[in-house]
Amino acid sequence: MAKALSKKAAQEKLDARKRQIANSTAMGDLIKRLDESKDYELRTYGYDKIQGLTQLHYEMLSFVAYKGLQKARCTRFDNFRNIVSIMWPKIEWNMWLEKAIQSLCDNDFVSWTGCAASGKTFAGALYATVWWICQPDVSAAVLTSTTKGMLRKRMWSEIQKLYTSMEWNPPGNMVDSKTVWQAVKGDEKNAIFGLAVKDGNTAAAVGHIQGIHTSRVLIVIDEATDTPQAIFDATANLYAGCEKFQMLVIGNPNSHYDPHGKFSEPKDGWASVGVETEDWETNIQLNGQPGYCLRFDAEKSPNIILGKTTYKYLMTEHQLDGARRKYGPESPLFWKFYRGFWAPSGVLKTVFNETLLAKMQAHLGYMFRREIKVIGACDPAFGGGDRAVLRFAVCGIT
């Protein structure tokens, strides 16, 4: 009798698992051993059934190649969520995380701009990890931040957490001291690389980026507002030498003319978007197509939309109200870190505002009519703890 009840209970458990799979693309940890059951039918997304391949393998194959998705009524985003549900079943999804991942599943050149406490860095690390582990032996994911300290505090910290919390044994070889997660021990080409790109590290980072040659390349630039333009320029070399290239730029909006602002510029100009615009197509990118910008506004945080603090790591109504009272709703800081949008003309105290510069087309460069003169200025910074600064300029008649 006990044996019969045991079989019945086992069958009921299996049926419950099948129903959960049928009703949700987020399959959770139940798939971990489902492939061992002869009664469980794999979703192969157009691939032939191969002995030994699990549901996770087919999700990864489908995510990389997009094969059979329309026929299977599935999207790359579905594959991504399925992979996450198998590998990290405890990850909590929210509206902003879904939008962020969706933007990367649908576009090759993506900018995320917006408020603090929006989960941008975690989302970037999660996407990079999933993207890489799907084909680690032919893939390089380059994650940059301004300094080594900020790299370890932000992006690499999230990579470490994902590595240690993975349900299955993590693939590859983690070398934390070098901020590298190699496909195999000693592989300096196919890996997740964490690079600092500022404060004396720019030339080395550019050389490292330009030296990467593999089939799949993903670039994630965190703190993009303070990232040297040379890092953005170095990506052109990568695009020309790989089969699949993707780029994500993350930052809090500061200026239309810093690297993050230029990468995020709407294809129809800044006048075509406003503080209520949540996403837009950007200028033509290396692939000849417009990029995509997704914006996170603290006033539309999932916690505020829900009317309660469900996600403690995202902006809350209490935090937003406190910042509004402390800084004022029209302060540059409130625009940058809370509204997540570029401050309107007149808010920043500058000699020439960006509206005037845009009107006079200053960003398009100059045509000099006569001989030009190159000038330079240096602040040696003998005291006060500041770093020395050297700048060059050209002057002449336009």
Please name every model-derived segment:
Residues 2-378, 390-397:
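Phosphate/NTP-binding elements of NTP-utilizing enzymes
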